[in-house]
Structure formats: C-alpha cells, structure tokens
Amino acid sequence: MTTITEELIARLKQGITSGVDLQPRQVNVGTVIAVGDGVARLSGLDQVVASEIVEFPPKAGRNESIYGIALNLEQDSVAAIILGDDETIEEGDMVTSTGRVISVPVGQGLLGRVVNPLGQPIDGKGPIVYEKTRPIERIAPGVITRKSVDTPVQTGIIAIDALIPIGRGQRELIIGDRQTGKTAVAIDTILNQKGQGMVCIYVAIGQRRAQVAQVVGTLERFGAMEYTIVVSATASESAALQYIAPYAGCAMGEEIMENGVMLNGQLVKDALIVYDDLSKHAVAYRQVSLLLRRPPGREAYPGDVFYLHSRLLERAARLNEEYGGGSLTALPVIETQANDVSAYIPTNVISITDGQIYLESDLFNAGQRPALNVGISVSRVGGAAQTRAMRAVAGKLKGELAQFRDLAAFAQFASDLDATTKAQIERGQRLQELLKQPQYQPLPVEDQVAVLYAATNNYLDDVPVPLITKWRDDFLAFLRTAHPEVRKLIYDNRLDRKFPTPEVKEALEAAIKEFKATSNYS
C-alpha cells in the first residue's frame, strides 16, 4: 500500500511540475497612474527602455492582454501609447515590461494578405503562417553596403518612364493636391510589376476603409494581390497604429530585400513600397506627441518630425552583390493644400527623397491624366535608371516638350506666329496628348518605345491632335496582332548601347509605314 501511495505522489508531482517554469525570474512590474486618449502614464517601470513593449495583463472584464509602446521615459513615470482599445485599462491596473521591442511577421506567408500594422490578418482568410519576425525600427543600410541605382522600375506610365525614370532602390515622392491621381499612379505602378520579379507593399495610412477595400479589390481584379502585401491603418484606427504602420511595412520590405521570397518558382529580392500617405502619418505622429505632452514646434508638429520620415525613407536602398543585391524602392505620397509645396511636411519629404512626381489639379481638371507637371517633376537618378532603348527615344522628347512650354508661353502674347513656330507648338501638343493614359492600363516598355519612336521621328505630324491617343491605341493593337516579332525585337534589344540597331529601326519603321498605309486619321 505504501508503494502505491509513493508512486501516486511521484506522478502527482510530475503532473504539477511538467511544462511549468519553476526558475525564478525578475519581472519589472508597475501600475497605471493615469489613462486617456490612447496614452497611459505608468509608475514603477524603472528598467523599461525606449520603444519597449509593455503589457497590460488580462483581468476581470478583459480576457486578453493589451500592449503599448513606452515612448516617454521621465524621472518618476513612463508614458506609453496603447495599441488597441484603452477603455478596459483603469487607474491602478498592473503593467509589466516585456523586454522586447515591437516586431511584425515577415516573409512568404504575407504575400496576398491584408494585415494591420501589428502584422495580424484583417482579410478574413485565416491566420498567417510565418517563421520569423523583424523589429519595425532599424538603422538604414550604410554607405558601404549600397550600390548605385541603375535598374529601372517600369511604372507602365509613359510620362514617368520617359521623363522621370524611377530606379530600383530609389525614393521618388508623389506629391499633389487631393483628387489629382496620386494613388492612381502608385496603383498603376504596382499593376505593372506583374511578371517583373518585384514584390509590392501598399501601406494605407489614415484612409477610409472603403477606399482601402477599393484598392484591394482593384489589385485582386488585375491579379496583382499574388505579389502584393497590404498594410492598413485606416482613419478609424488609433493614432498609435497609424504612426507605426509605415515602419511595419518597411520591415516586411527589408526582409524581401535581404533574404528574398519565392515568386512563381524564382527567388525575388526586389521590393516596392508605397506609403499612402505620409501627410496623414505626420498628423498621427503630431497627435501622439501632443498627447505625450512633448513640446510643439512649427504647425504644432514636434521637433523630430523630420527625423520621423528621414529614418523611414533612408531604409530604401539598392544593396551591392556582397550583401545580396536586393533592393527596396519607396514611393511616398504627400498631399498638399492648394498646390503649396513649400509647406512644412512637403518640403521635409522633398529634401529627403531622390526626386518628385508633381501632380497638378489644374492639369487634372483640363483632362491631362496623369496630371503630371513635367516642368517641376524631377528624378535625381535620371537616365541611369532607364533602359538604353528608352533613353534613346526619350532624349528628344524632353527637349521638344521643354521647347513647347517656352513657345506656348510666348504664343499667348504674340498675335501672329511664323510657320516654324506654329509647327513646333502643334508638335508639342501632339507629344502632350501622347502622354495621356487611362487608369489601370500600364504599357510595357516595348510598347512605350515603339510609340515614342514614332512620335519623335515625325511619323505623327499628319495626325490631328484630338486623334493622337486613338492612333496610339490602334497602332499598339496592330503591333500586337500583326507584328508581335517587332515588339519582341525591341524588348530583346532594349539594353543595346546602339539602340535603335539597324534591324530594330528597319522593322519598326516598316511596321509604322504599313499601319499608316492601312489606316486613315485625317
């Protein structure tokens, strides 16, 4: 009988202690002394570090833990922003430090998913399978690890690819008033990455839920979600979640840049990230800072609002071969008020980025879509980020459009113009018309080169200005059906230093002449 009792006691001990960590641990525990507006003031957390996650454990009336980020470390208290609903947190509640900074899931499992800034799925497609996480904040790659930008990101938009080329690893700002097509440019760029070996991340900050749902619907309709991750922090989310959203998206992009993901059976190490938009991000950070009682500066923004965006955008890079050769290209979006690009946040982001695509409401209302102001827009990478073929045909285009702008301004004050000036103005109008492009219809590089070659070599001089876009669409349809070999020839020779090669020139000119002979646009 004694043996059975001892055996029973031994089993009970084993059952009690199995799976239980009996080692003593030091836990930094504090209490909530005040809470409100998404900010909790805590006492007793004397070992917490900046940006550390703090945990409000479950209690009566709350089944799950709530987390926050410690941002203000003061002499006798800590102020933390709460990531979630603060209604169940009360004065006197217990809070513990976790010893870790905020991290998000990264890697293959996120492709095709819509997540919140904490990496949690919000698309109703079940849990995300992931093997690792990354901290959302990280120091940008150093000078030694980087490589100069020399490979293009084809946006599929003629005006951008020809005049303001974007390279892999570049940071190109999209700036303009509300309703000028900023998001449309970004979405068209994502759609055009199909089959280009590029993973796209779309970060929606402070937008309406309906608008985010519309973007996701568009990406699904065109088959772009299979290589896209959407990070959504809508206007209904707390300012704290809107503040961390772009950093979370950037961490996901850095994982692709450094380690890559499998896409259509190939390892892809190039990522494109769209921050839509950083104006709302700055407003969310201003709200958080004012609630934390940080001293306000110009336009009530805190003093480190420049650093807010510079530390984010500097993480975009093209790594050299020694470090994997991956890239992270950033397209930040900024919304201006009444075309004022000299306001605080726009000037900050303009000075951080490698160029800007400036969209104007006047051009948009006049029917120029995309409403690109070619005069103010610039890419500091320039022709280095273009294929040889595009550089060859776009060189003339820039000069002729610049001439047209000067002559058009002069023509307003001159009553009668000579024939040469009239011809140049008409030519400029044709080129401007050629740059109009419907939304969700990005063009591959071979189609862009074919059209621009025809335009810059006087083949459109007899086509009336109102019929230019119809001529372009019909000509490209003719090339696709009757002469696919010409498109293939352009694509295969796009990197040739002597583009257009005699073979390409002969085939392309023959196709243009054949099309003109069989069609009438008078």
Swiss-Prot record:
Which reaction does this chain catalyze?
ATP + H2O + 4 H(+)(in) = ADP + phosphate + 5 H(+)(out)
Site (Required for activity): give the residues. Answer: S377
Membrane-topology annotation of the record = Peripheral membrane protein
Write down the EC number: 7.1.2.2
Q: Which residues bind ATP?
A: G176, D177, R178, Q179, T180, G181, K182, T183
Can you name one GO molecular function term for this protein?
proton-transporting ATP synthase activity, rotational mechanism
Q: What's a GO biological-process term for it?
A: proton motive force-driven ATP synthesis
Q: Tell me, in a sentence or two, what this protein's role is.
A: Produces ATP from ADP in the presence of a proton gradient across the membrane. The alpha chain is a regulatory subunit.
Q: How does it assemble?
A: F-type ATPases have 2 components, CF(1) - the catalytic core - and CF(0) - the membrane proton channel. CF(1) has five subunits: alpha(3), beta(3), gamma(1), delta(1), epsilon(1). CF(0) has four main subunits: a(1), b(1), b'(1) and c(9-12).
HAMAP family per record: ATP_synth_alpha_bact
Q: What is the designated name of this protein?
A: ATP synthase subunit alpha
